[in-house]
Amino acid sequence: MSKKKSPQRYKMHVKTGDTIQVISGRDKGKVGEVLKTIPTTSEVVVKGVNVKTKHVKPQQEGESGQIATFEAPIHSSNVMLYSTKEQVASRISYTFTEEGRKVRMLKKTGEIIDS
């Protein structure tokens, strides 16, 4: 009998609520907000990015089918944090505040993301 391993969790540079820009793929250049992070697969769901359509069958008699749209996840390596003040995407670095808290900072602008 083998022990069941817990799934690998990846360290991600983005968090829920961050503003990001897509840097590769079909939606390259789009800016949106992270709705959900999936650390086990290192993926993020971004508002208005990678929108898919799904045809839903009617569930009950007399009900009509629907076409639903939803945001599918994209890999976190395809997104970069975005500064809304400077209108530029940037990598991040980790720094410490005067109080000793570890915060994320945009490398290009020096803007602190975690407040």
Curated annotation (Swiss-Prot):
Gene3D superfamilies in UniProt: 2.30.30.30
SUPFAM superfamilies membership: Translation proteins SH3-like domain
Keywords in alphabetical order: Ribonucleoprotein, Ribosomal protein, RNA-binding, rRNA-binding
Superkingdom: Bacteria
GO molecular function, one term: rRNA binding
One Pfam family named in its UniProt record: ribosomal_L24
GO cellular component: a single term: ribonucleoprotein complex
PROSITE patterns tied to this protein: RIBOSOMAL_L24
InterPro entries, per the entry: KOW, Rib_uL2_dom2, Ribosomal_uL24, Ribosomal_uL24_CS, Ribosomal_uL24_KOW, Translation_prot_SH3-like_sf
GO biological process, one term: translation
NCBIfam families: rplX_bact
Annotated function: One of two assembly initiator proteins, it binds directly to the 5'-end of the 23S rRNA, where it nucleates assembly of the 50S subunit. One of the proteins that surrounds the polypeptide exit tunnel on the outside of the subunit.
Family: Belongs to the universal ribosomal protein uL24 family.
PANTHER family per the UniProt record, alphabetical: MITOCHONDRIAL RIBOSOMAL PROTEIN L24
Record text on subunit structure and interactions: Part of the 50S ribosomal subunit.
Entry protein name: Large ribosomal subunit protein uL24
Lineage: Bacteria, Bacillati, Cyanobacteriota, Cyanophyceae, Oscillatoriophycideae
Gene that produces this protein: rplX
